[in-house]
Amino acid sequence: MKYLIRARLEVDGRVEKHDVIGAIFGQTESLLGSDFSLEELQNKDKLGRIHVELKYQGTKTIGSISVPSNLSRVETAIIAAMLETIDKIGPYPAKITIEEIRDLRLERLEKIKQRARELLRLMKEKEPDIREIIREVLQEEQAKAQVAKLVEYGPERLPAGPGVEKADTIIVVEGRSDVNTLLRYGYTNVIALGGAREKVPETIKRLAEQKKVILFVDGDRGGELILKNVLPQMKVDYVARAPEGREVESLTGREIAQALSQMKPAEIVARELGIEAAEKPAEEAVKREEEAAAEAKPPAPAVQEKAAKPPEEKPPTVKFTIPKAVLEAAKELRGTLEAIVYDKEWRELDRLKVRELYDYISKSEPGRIYAVVFDGIITQRLLDIASEKGVGIIIGNRIGNKITHKPTNVKFLTFSDLF
C-alpha cells in the first residue's frame, strides 16, 4: 500500500465496530460513482481492510479509523474527503475528521536508508583479512585430502569406492571418472562397470545378488545404450540418469542428489526402452509382494494378556480400489515433483508442488483429503500430518529410510507397488 488514511471518530451514542463499518460503506455508496465504490476498490486491491478502534466516554463513542490505500495521491485524498461526509452512525450523530494521510513509501525508504547504513558499517567491519584467507584455503585443501580414495575391487580390478563391500546398496556407474566424481561428494558405495563393455563383470553380478543396485548412467545416447546392455544381464533395482545431455562425471553434488532422488524402478525403465530386464531372485520378488500387500492392510491390534482374543479372530483386510485414471495420473507425475490430492470419490481436489504438500495438508479440514499421489518421498513427518488430518491413502515415489511409526489409519504405497 502507498498511503494510510487516519481519521478521528466521535459519535453521540454507544456504537459497535460493525456499525461504523456499515456506515462507511452505506453512506459512501454511489456517492462519487462506481469508480469510488469502496467495495469495488477493495476487490481490486486498491484499498486495504478498514480498521476501527473504539472506546467509550460516558454515553459517547470515540475512536480511530485507518484505511490503507493503493490509489494515487489525488484519489486517496478524495477517499479521505468522502469519509468526512459521514454524519450519522446507527441512530446517533457522528463526525469523522481526517488527522493525517501518511505516505508509507517514505517510511519504507527511510527504513531502507537506515538498513543500508547498518550494512555498510557491517561491510567495513568485515574487511578481508589475509591471514583468515590463508587459513580457509588450508582448511579447504585439508578437506579435499580427506576425500575417500578410489580402490580397485575384485579380480577385474574395477574402480570402486571403499564402502562398496559393506554397503547394503551400491551405485553402479560407467567408468573411473564417474567413481571419482561420486567419491568427491561422499558416495563411497560406488563401483564402475569398467567402461562401455558388452559383458557385465562377474564381480558386479555377484554383488547384485546380495545388495540393492542403483544403475546411474549419463543422460545421453551413451547412457541409454548402457541401460539396454546391462538391464538384461543382471539384477538392477533402480535406474538414475544424469540430466539430459549431461554426463555423471560433470555433475555437482546437488545435481547428483537430485538425480538419485528421481530414480525409477528398473522394470519401468526396461519397459520404456522396450527391453526385458533380468529376473530377480524368486525370494526377493515374494518379499516385495508381501511388503506391498502389508502396506494395504492395517496392522493387527496389540495383544493384551488379560483380554487375549482367540487366534481365529484376525483383523479384516481393508481393501480399496484405485481408479485407472488415478493410476495413469500417477505415471505422468514421475519426474514432475508435483502432487495431486483426491476426495473420497477420487475426484481431483488440487494439484501442487511437492514442497507445498505438507503445508497444504496441515491447513486442510480433517477428512477433506482422502488420498494423496505425489512424486516424492514418503516421510514420517508427512505420515503424521496425514494421520492427523484423516488422509486415508498416500502413494509416493519411494519410502524414506526413517519411518519409525506407521499410523494405523493411513495406508501408504509406492509407485513400484502399483505399476
From Swiss-Prot:
Q: Which reaction does it catalyse?
A: ssDNA + n NTP = ssDNA/pppN(pN)n-1 hybrid + (n-1) diphosphate
Pfam families attached to this UniProt entry: Toprim (PF01751)
Q: Which UniProt keywords apply?
A: DNA replication, DNA-directed RNA polymerase, Exosome, Magnesium, Metal-binding, Nucleotidyltransferase, Primosome, Transcription, Transferase
- Cofactor(s) needed: Mg(2+)
Which SUPFAM superfamilies does this entry report, sorted A to Z? Toprim domain
Cellular component aspect of the GO annotation: cytoplasm; DNA-directed RNA polymerase complex; exosome (RNase complex); primosome complex
UniProt binding sites for Mg(2+) 2 = 218, 220
Q: Which GO terms describe its molecular function?
A: DNA-directed RNA polymerase activity; metal ion binding; poly(A) binding
Query: Is the Thylakoid keyword given for this protein?
Result: no
Q: Which residues form the signal peptide?
A: none
What Gene3D superfamilies does the database record attribute to this sequence?
3.40.1360.10
Q: Which residues bind Mg(2+) 1?
A: 174, 218
Q: Please give the superkingdom of this protein's source.
A: Archaea
Q: One biological process GO term for this chain?
A: DNA replication, synthesis of primer
Q: Which residues form the Toprim domain?
A: 168-244
Segments of this protein annotated with the region Disordered: 280-317
Q: How does it assemble?
A: Forms a ternary complex with MCM helicase and DNA. Component of the archaeal exosome complex.
Q: Which family does the UniProt entry place this protein in?
A: Belongs to the archaeal DnaG primase family.
Put simply, this protein is called DNA primase DnaG
